């Protein structure tokens, strides 16, 4: 991927080897007009390098599901579902809404064909999200689904779940919610993308965590023909699933409350005919939706950058 990105750029600078002061100088020396940072407050971020405002316009996008709180970042790219009108006061940045969705999904070229679990397989809910998202709110949301379908199982796939302490913690938390450890399958880590995606063949319906929804995991599940049920939350991180599903034309999988979440998820595995019909068309539905329309997304992103720059120019002339 690095090679592909480098080939598509007019210039490429390895900023990992630069300290914050050197990165500040590198941005200024190249006359960058609009700078987009993609990390926010995540590991390895370079927010301190922005402290002296090295570019006239600075935006944050995609990588962090909240305001950065950074005084030198002007704009934050979101959409009208993740950050509806009226939520502006939650952010230090001004919001740019890239409707219908703030991101675009590029399906992997080597993804296997979608496959349904066998007819004799028990109803299996699943999540391939990071284990740190499986906190109390998520377990409180998912446990009633498993109770509503007593013969069902839950498949969890997360890199850290292979660690004994993490695995034990997950099982203990579900146990406290009345879910026996024998109903939970911890799937093995896959060495490559194809192997990772192939494991969706073990899952009937995916469950979205809350309040920190899946993003790539949701898109991957849909691409592999697995419907994802999400709870519409009250902040960006808890509304990403809603944005993705509505953009894909799958608003029926968005639950307004916990009771509806249980009803939707349990209803899908109980109605095999409906589930088979839905799964058979999911990849095509996603492929035809704005969520995978890269050229259209590119135009929206371009137009947003241009609008931010023009706004700065107008203010500078005033």
What are these regions (language model features)?
Residues 1-72, 81-86, 154-274, 279-294:
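Conserved nucleotide-cofactor-binding alpha/beta core module
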Residues 25-28, 143, 147, 266, ...:
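Surface-exposed alpha-helical segments enriched in charged/polar residues
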Residues 72-73, 92-93, 120-122, 151, ...:
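Active-site lining segments that contact anionic ligands and/or coordinate catalytic metals
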Residues 79-141, 292, 298-317:
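Glycine-rich phosphate/pyrophosphate-binding loop
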Residues 100-192, 199-201:
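Conserved catalytic-core segment of nucleotide-activated headgroup transferases in glycan assembly
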Residues 147, 269-270, 287, 306, ...:
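Residues at helix-coil transition
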Residues 178, 317-318:
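Short, flexible coil/linker elements and helix-boundary hinge sites characteristic
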């Amino acid at each position: 991927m690095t090679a592909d990105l480098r080939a598509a750029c007019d210039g490429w600078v390895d900023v990992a080897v630069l300290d914050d002061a050197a990165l500040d100088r590198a941005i200024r020396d190249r006359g960058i007009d609009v700078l987009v940072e993609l990390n926010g407050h995540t590991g390895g971020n370079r927010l301190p390098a922005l402290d002296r405002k090295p570019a006239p316009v600075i935006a944050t996008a995609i990588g962090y599901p909240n305001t950065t709180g950074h005084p030198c970042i002007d704009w934050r790219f979101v959409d009208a579902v993740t950050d509806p009108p009226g939520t502006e006061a939650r952010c230090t940045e001004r919001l740019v809404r890239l409707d219908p969705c703030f991101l675009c999904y590029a399906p992997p070229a080597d993804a296997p064909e979608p496959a349904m679990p066998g007819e004799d397989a028990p109803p299996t809910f699943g999540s391939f999200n990071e284990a740190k998202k499986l906190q109390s709110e998520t377990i409180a949301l998912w446990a009633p689904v498993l109770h509503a379908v007593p013969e069902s199982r839950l498949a969890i796939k997360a890199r850290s779940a292979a660690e004994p302490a993490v695995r034990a913690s997950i099982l203990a938390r579900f146990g406290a919610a009345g879910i026996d450890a024998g109903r939970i399958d911890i799937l093995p880590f896959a060495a490559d993308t194809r192997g990772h995606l192939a494991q969706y063949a073990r899952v009937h319906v995916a469950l979205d965590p809350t309040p920190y929804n899946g993003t790539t995991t949701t898109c991957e599940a849909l691409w592999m023909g697995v419907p994802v049920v999400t709870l519409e939350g009250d902040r960006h991180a808890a509304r990403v699933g809603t944005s993705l599903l509505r953009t894909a034309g799958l608003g029926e999988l968005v639950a307004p409350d916990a009771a509806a979440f249980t009803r939707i998820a349990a209803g899908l595995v109980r109605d095999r005919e409906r589930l088979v019909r839905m799964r058979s068309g999911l990849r095509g539905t996603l492929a035809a939706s704005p969520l995978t329309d890269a050229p259209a997304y590119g135009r929206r992103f371009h137009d947003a950058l241009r609008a931010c720059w023009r706004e700065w120019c107008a203010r500078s002339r005033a």
